[in-house]
Amino acid sequence: MADTCPRCGSPGVVGDGCPRCRVKVSLYLASLEKMRRPPTPRPVATLAPVALAAPPRATTAPTPSATPRAAARRLAFHGSGGTLFGIHIVNILRTLVTVGVYRFWGRVRVRRYMLSQTAFEGDRLAYHGTGKELLRGFLKAILVFGLPVTALNLAGQLSGDELLANAAQVLTWAAVMVFVPVAMVGARRYRLSRTSWRGIRFSFHGRIWDFIKLFVGGSLLTSLTLGFYYPVFQTNQQAFMVSHARFGQRPFRFEGRGRDLLRSYLLAVLLTLPTLGLCWFWYQARKIRYFWEHTFFEAARFRATVTGRSLLNLTIGNLLLLLVTLGFAWPWVLVRNARFAFAYLTLEGVLDLAGIVQEPQRASATGDALSGFLGADVDLG
């Protein structure tokens, strides 16, 4: 008998699979039950009557430092470079045969594999994007951004008027300054909406216009201050991206301030020449720790312990792998990066998942395509 899908509400579900969201209904219901099941109460022990005795000597109460902390939870990555290499080779061959069209489906295969090999609390994440969505988003990005900017440049060059050519360049720069934040927000919204854990999807609720104002204003201030505003600008972007993200109906929270990174940033600027630029690995590690340690989900808080030395070793190892193999080690580099990120990241504190429910959402892949087109790719963390 036909039924309704418990995840997307689509009617006409026959059997155990939804034809619209492709979820396995029995597994979805089981995961929800697992999340909402209250802890099993312990049996209360009864005390038999005992003979009266002298009261025991008072014992010292445990100090606050002896109180056990909430367990630290970790993400785990179970993928392998060999398996991802097989996916990569097939993607290359199919992309060549289809004159580049298959690359959208290839990108989906890589994302799906990476997320399916990422586990939290014993359950894997899932990716629900499709190649058709990415292709459609790419075509929209070409129509919305690529063609107008190209036409603007050609008009300025063919006019033969220096004033018109300069005006065309200014308008092109203004268009890029608007489309980059549009692409960043669109990519964030699309990718989070296509990522789920235990059948519950992530989402993003930031308004594009708010981020355009933040991005344009921050870019201008960074230029006017000769780059010294940059750590504040980066922190403001991170705050926007994190604070408008949700898991189910519950939001993430970011409490960082850009001025906290200013001292480390200025020190890195001063040490750039003496250290041949290597000091920026330590600044990057400091920024990663700061961003994660000021990110919260409910009462739980993220912790990061990455160091500049470990980040430098990872980068050198990745570069050597790519150079020695002429780029064929790219899948192993992705796996190394994922394992590295999760090895230094924990989530500490009380985490109540029982009341989380799925929110209705809809997101286009146009922003995801624009981010790739403009090189403004954005990810969590």
Each predicted region: which residue ranges?
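Hydrophobic, aromatic-rich membrane-embedded alpha-helical segments
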Residues: 88-109, 215-235, 266-284, 319-336
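Membrane-proximal intracellular helices of multi-pass ion channels
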Residues: 137, 318, 323, 361-381
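Membrane-interface extramembranous regions at the lipid-water interface
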Residues: 54-90, 105-139, 186-215, 233-266, ...
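Long, low-complexity intrinsically disordered regions
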Residues: 33-65
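Cys/His-rich metal-coordination motifs, chiefly Zn-binding "fingers/knuckles"
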Residues: 1-45
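Membrane-helix interface segments in multi-pass membrane proteins
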Residues: 148-176, 284, 333-361, 374-381
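Hydrophobic, ordered structural segments
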Residues: 129-135, 141-243, 277, 331
